[in-house]
């Protein structure tokens, strides 16, 4: 007689800001500028096992607002939005997509709010980050890893 298959368990234990920094290197003069800044976003995800079935996933965004004509940084915000997730009874080959796609999709709205709120509190108009397709980023990373090192395990860190 076969044992009944246990149902997968996915629980969000905690969502939190792990790290947050804001730099306004040319304050207060930068507040007198009339030029609209160019916004650059760098995005990365990472994960690690805390213990057993408990995982930490971190989505990091670095937003830089630069005055193009003067090549001057208005502000730079870096936020690490993290979550602790309990994941149990998920097959080994399915855990990476959960950590690389599902968890970042849960964390991203919190990250977007953190960035927007921080920029607004710094005295600038809010920066609203566009939605991110973490599944496409994950698949691209998997394809790149398969091409570059076909026999090596895939690094689950994604950069965008």
Curated annotation (Swiss-Prot):
One of its GO terms (molecular function) is unfolded protein binding. Homotetramer, a dimer of dimers. One homotetramer interacts with 1 SecA dimer. Keywords: Chaperone, Cytoplasm, Protein transport, Translocation, Transport. One of the proteins required for the normal export of preproteins out of the cell cytoplasm. It is a molecular chaperone that binds to a subset of precursor proteins, maintaining them in a translocation-competent state. It also specifically binds to its receptor SecA. This is Protein-export protein SecB. The keyword DNA repair does not apply. Its main location: cytoplasm. GO terms for cellular component: cytoplasm. The gene is secB.
């Amino acid at each position: 007689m076969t044992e009944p298959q246990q149902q997968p368990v996915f629980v969000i234990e905690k969502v939190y800001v792990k790290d947050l920094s804001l730099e306004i290197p040319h304050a207060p003069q930068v507040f007198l500028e009339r030029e609209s800044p160019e916004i650059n976003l760098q995005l990365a995800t990472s994960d690690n096992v805390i213990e057993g079935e408990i995982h930490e996933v971190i989505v990091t965004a670095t937003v830089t607002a630069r005055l193009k004509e003067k090549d001057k940084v208005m502000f730079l915000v870096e936020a690490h939005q993290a979550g602790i997730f309990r994941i149990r009874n998920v097959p080994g080959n399915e855990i990476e997509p959960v950590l690389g796609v599902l968890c970042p999709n849960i964390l991203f709205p919190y990250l977007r709010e953190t960035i927007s709120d921080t920029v607004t509190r710094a005295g600038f108009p809010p920066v609203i980050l566009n939605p991110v397709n973490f599944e496409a980023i994950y698949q691209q990373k998997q394809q790149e890893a398969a091409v570059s090192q076909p026999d090596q395990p895939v690094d689950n860190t994604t950069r965008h």
